[in-house]
Amino acid sequence: MNASPPVHPQTETPGLPGVSFGTSADGMPVALVGDTAFAMAKARDGRRYLVTAWRLSKPMGEWTRDDFYGHSGERADEAAFRARVLENAEHQHEKRALSRHEICSRASTPWGASQGATVYAEGVTSHSTAGHGGFKLSAERNRKVHPMLRSAGGWYEEDAAWAIVAITFPHLFTAFERRCAERTVKDSWPDAWEAIFGTILQPGESHEKDRRSFEREHADHWVVASAITSKHEPGFVEVVATLGGKRGAGTEERRFLVPSGEYSIG
């Protein structure tokens, strides 16, 4: 008598068509949003990570860890995994409702020749190149950007400056994109954020503002600039420290041995 194959139930999420959750062949929590597959994979150290794949042809119950290649950060538990999947589903649903459309483009950009572009609205275009990309705003659109954040040429690269476009024209972006943009502008341009929105960012709300505070408070302290496990003194970490953590030619350095058990990164 043949044993019955394992059952891997798949559930559709009410209110969000096209979102399904299930279990992979090797026991991972998995999900499908449109053509994007998600899984919560366990690493050797026991931590769990969100991994992704695109257009898997197999049924969800036949997926395995080897099918996934994208890495999207650590997740604490299955609840956090499901929350991230639903956030992505909301993002994709909202994006379909926007009037973005793809066009062929060979425009010259600061990052090389455009290999394609997405038009968000008249005068707001995102270009992709071989190595980078970003937004180009028309002169009229660019005048709407706050002077503290405005790029003279109307180009805004995709790593951080894209967020300037998003907070200037929020109606062209999804809720997820707007949240990411808010975080990016606070972290990178806190002075502009405070001026535009009439608020004061508190400790922990801006990487850049926190960095400045740290440098002021520790300007006269020896701050670790680099560290390696010592090859000469087992059980110790060799650290290089500079005043205020400054770097560059001519900066005075001091070297210390710190017991490995007492050294922590942070």
Model-inferred region functions:
Residues A195-H232, V240, F256-V258, Y263:
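Ubiquitin-like/PB1-type beta-grasp interaction modules and other compact soluble beta-rich domains
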Residues R75-G116, F197-D220:
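Surface-exposed beta-loop interaction hotspot
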Residues H127-R150, G244-R255:
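A short, structured beta-strand/loop element
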Residues P6-E90, A225-G266:
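N-terminal accessory interaction module
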Residues D66-A80, D159-P203, F256-G266:
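Short, compact, well-ordered microdomains
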Residues A117-T118, T125-T129, R143-A152, C180-P203:
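A solvent-exposed interaction/effector surface
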Residues R106-L137:
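Charged, low-complexity intrinsically disordered regulatory segments in eukaryotic signaling
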Residues S151-D159:
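Short, charged/polar micro-motifs that form catalytic or ligand-binding hotspots
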